Design a protein with these regions (language model features):
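Short, low-complexity disordered leader/linker segments with a strong preference
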Residues: 1-28, 354
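Extracytoplasmic ligand-binding site segments that recognize negatively charged/polar headgroups
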Residues: 80-86, 90-226
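A ligand-binding cleft/hinge motif common to bilobed small-molecule-binding domains
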Residues: 86-88, 234-249
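Periplasmic-binding protein-like
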Residues: 198, 203-207, 244-270
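Mature extracytoplasmic/periplasmic domains
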Residues: 260, 269-331
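Conserved C-terminal helix/tail region of periplasmic/extracytoplasmic solute-binding proteins
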Residues: 324-354
Length: 354
């Protein structure tokens, strides 16, 4: 009897223990650009899939690559690499190949973006286009009554300690444009010679007296404008959106030299333990209604043109969706930089210069 009682007691304990444990909802971990996990559109996915979204934000492509290669790749399920590092991440085995049959909205995405080779390696597709846009010149409309027509205004003697630049390689590209290194081939911005890089370095060191602070996050630049510490900077449409919502007098323009820009993809890391859930998240994020919601928050152009049907005419015009092809000619989309280490070396020398 004691033996039977003991077994029954153990079984009862097991039943009680099992019944007393509530299964925790899965957490999908993101490493993405700012604005890509806003509650306004992420919350609906959490509710419908009974999961949690946890997001960490990156300030540059180099930060993303460093984290993936530094042993923390297993901490993340979904990443949003830009067009300068997407191919490298896929080729390095840091992202998982996608089964496109799981993405009903994939064929709705811009054919131009889908057909780019950025995330295609050995016949596999490793990411879905998500958003795209420029790195525009942002300016205080009280200081500049008319939109500045050239990046060279940042070097103006009247702007000492009144501008900000992005702590990222895009600042090198911008200086290279001023020096004419984008002609005749804009792609040359991403493969400059040593001599050209040294000339870029000199040009950027000349800019340093005007730099109040280099920004690394969108929130940081937003604060610099709101605190009236700067009146001009290279920025993101997201920052323009944030400042306009705060009623700050901000303007945004692409100068006559044009500008660089990016195509961001969503990828699933090869180390993810939630690949099925991550795939469902990617599908949700490229659906037309979600793409419209992302544009509301970020001011970025949607990869899914069908998002336009949910927008007002003013929003479509502000995103240049009425003339996308012409708008894209003003943007030199980031490409892989073969000598990225050399570019970073030059940029670090600029930052260290007195």
């Amino acid at each position: 009897m004691k033996k039977n009682f003991a077994v029954f007691g153990l079984a009862g304990m097991l039943v009680f223990t099992a019944g007393g444990c509530k299964k925790q909802p899965p957490t999908l971990s993101l490493l993405v650009w700012e604005g890509y996990a806003d509650p306004s559109f992420v919350r609906a996915f959490e509710q419908s899939h009974k999961c949690k979204i946890s997001a960490a934000y990156m300030g540059s492509s180099d930060e993303l690559v460093a984290k993936l290669r530094g042993g923390s790749a297993s901490n993340y399920d979904v990443i949003s690499p830009s067009s300068d590092v997407a191919t490298m991440i896929a080729s390095a085995g840091l992202a998982a190949p996608l089964d496109l049959s799981k993405f009903p909205s994939y064929l709705q995405l811009s054919e131009r973006l889908r057909e780019m080779p950025l995330v295609r390696v050995n016949g596999n597709v490793y990411g879905v286009p998500f958003t795209w846009g420029p790195n525009p010149l942002l300016y205080d409309t009280k200081t500049f009554r008319q939109p500045p027509d050239s990046w060279t205004i940042l070097w103006g003697p009247d702007l000492k300690n009144k501008i900000s630049v992005w702590d990222e390689l895009s600042t090198i590209y911008m200086a290279a444009q001023i020096l004419g290194y984008d002609k005749p081939d804009p792609g040359h911005l991403y493969n400059l010679t040593d001599e050209e890089l040294n000339n870029v370095k000199k040009k950027l060191i000349e800019l340093k007296p005007n730099i109040r602070k280099m920004w690394s996050t969108g929130g940081e630049l937003t604060n610099l404008f709101e605190n009236q510490e700067v009146v001009a900077a290279m920025g993101w449409p997201l920052i323009t959106n944030q400042l306009r919502k705060a009623n700050y007098p901000i303007g945004e323009t692409i100068p006559k030299e044009n500008t660089t820009g990016w195509i961001d993809h969503l990828m699933i890391t090869s180390a993810s333990e939630h690949k099925d859930l991550a795939a469902e998240f990617l599908e949700y994020m490229i659906e037309a209604k979600t793409q419209k919601a992302v544009a509301d928050v970020t001011g970025y152009d949607p990869a899914n043109p069908q998002a336009a049907q949910f927008m007002t005419e003013d929003q479509r015009k502000s995103l240049h969706l009425d003339n996308v092809d012409l708008y894209m000619t003003r943007i030199y989309f980031w490409q892989q930089v073969p000598r990225r280490d050399k570019y970073n070396e030059i940029w670090n020398e600029v930052k260290a210069a007195q």
